[in-house]
Amino acid sequence: MLQYQIDRIEHQVADDRAQTGVFLIGPLERGQATTLGNSLRRVLMGGLEGSAITAVRIAGVNHEYATIPGVREDVLDILLNCKQLSVNSRTSELEIGRLVVTGPAQVKAKDLQFSSQVQVVDGDRQIATVHEGHSLELEVHVERGIGYRPVDRHNEDISAIDLLQIDAVFMPVRRVNFTIDETAVAEGGSTRERLRIEIVTDGSTTPDDALAESANQLIELFQPLATVTMVEEPGLEPEPSAESQIPLEELNLSVRAYNCLKRAQVNSVSDLMGFSYEDLLEIKNFGSKSADEVIEALERIGISIPQSRTST
């Protein structure tokens, strides 16, 4: 199996704490870089668990189209600003952050007070502007999840009239790009490939951790395929042999034996295979001579039946 290595050739942290990592993976066989790049990108963009603000409560506000006295931004603007906050919750439980700010003040993400389980990634991100003589009291709910969860899919438990729910974007990876380069020709003349993948996160996780987590998810997905076992579905019977499908007429039995079997609803060899020699003798007007005749006819096509019902 071809051995390859992974090198991180670039790592940047932006002003909003977003992180960018660039990795080189190779050498790979032709076609493997595309397979690897597409698989990693799919998991990175939609399969990683992340944290997001899912609801906001503002004192004195019970709908998203309201305005707040003494606050420059309207409620919709504040909800959008909260939606864009990057947070990292280390628990699967609902976490609540609160702030009370008296103007004049620029209300920022760092003003939110959370438990030790939640980290605000970009504390300088603006939430609202409060004028002198006014105040803003705000509460945000933080949850963990995967992918994108629109408002209409929220649990009905969170249905308080003053709790403004927002679309939750749990994806910690903002962007993934990859390119494929050809590397040196290997022995035998085959060209190798190298995957260059760029991962941009919101800062709640590092590109290194995001890449490792996506790889682990792919391993878990494919691992069961390495030990595939065939399980016969219940109720399925094996395909009948060609001999068992031979009609009774083709056994060339005597008229007496043939008529007795037909009256007993025996129409083919497969029907006869359910009989033992003793069963044949119990058919009305069917003697040992007729039974022996049937046994011989079956043996000519390679089929035998037991002498008694208990024979194996």
UniProtKB/Swiss-Prot annotation:
Checking SUPFAM superfamilies in the record gives: C-terminal domain of RNA polymerase alpha subunit, Insert subdomain of RNA polymerase alpha subunit, RBP11-like subunits of RNA polymerase
Reactions catalysed, semicolon-separated, are: RNA(n) + a ribonucleoside 5'-triphosphate = RNA(n+1) + diphosphate
Q: Where is this region: Alpha N-terminal domain (alpha-NTD)?
A: 1-229
Note whether Flavoprotein occurs among the keywords: no
What terms describe the molecular function in GO for this protein? DNA binding; DNA-directed RNA polymerase activity; protein dimerization activity
- InterPro entries named in the record: DNA-dir_RNA_pol_insert, DNA-dir_RNA_pol_RpoA/D/Rpb3, DNA-dir_RpoA, RBP11-like, RNAP_asu_C, RNApol_insert_sf
Note the superkingdom of the native organism.
Bacteria
Q: Which keywords does UniProt give here?
A: DNA-directed RNA polymerase, Nucleotidyltransferase, Transcription, Transferase
One Pfam assignment: RNA_pol_A_CTD
Is Nucleotidyltransferase set as a keyword in this record? Answer: yes
Provide the top EC class: transferase
Name the segments for region: Alpha C-terminal domain (alpha-CTD): 236-312
The record's annotation in CDD domains points to: RNAP_alpha_NTD
GO biological process: one example = DNA-templated transcription
Describe its assembly: In cyanobacteria the RNAP catalytic core is composed of 2 alpha, 1 beta, 1 beta', 1 gamma and 1 omega subunit. When a sigma factor is associated with the core the holoenzyme is formed, which can initiate transcription.
Family label: Belongs to the RNA polymerase alpha chain family.
Domain description from the entry? Answer: The N-terminal domain is essential for RNAP assembly and basal transcription, whereas the C-terminal domain is involved in interaction with transcriptional regulators and with upstream promoter elements.
- Known function: DNA-dependent RNA polymerase catalyzes the transcription of DNA into RNA using the four ribonucleoside triphosphates as substrates.
Q: What's the protein called, per UniProt?
A: DNA-directed RNA polymerase subunit alpha
- Origin species, per record, is Prochlorococcus marinus (strain MIT 9303)
Lineage, uppermost ranks:
Bacteria, Bacillati, Cyanobacteriota, Cyanophyceae, Synechococcales
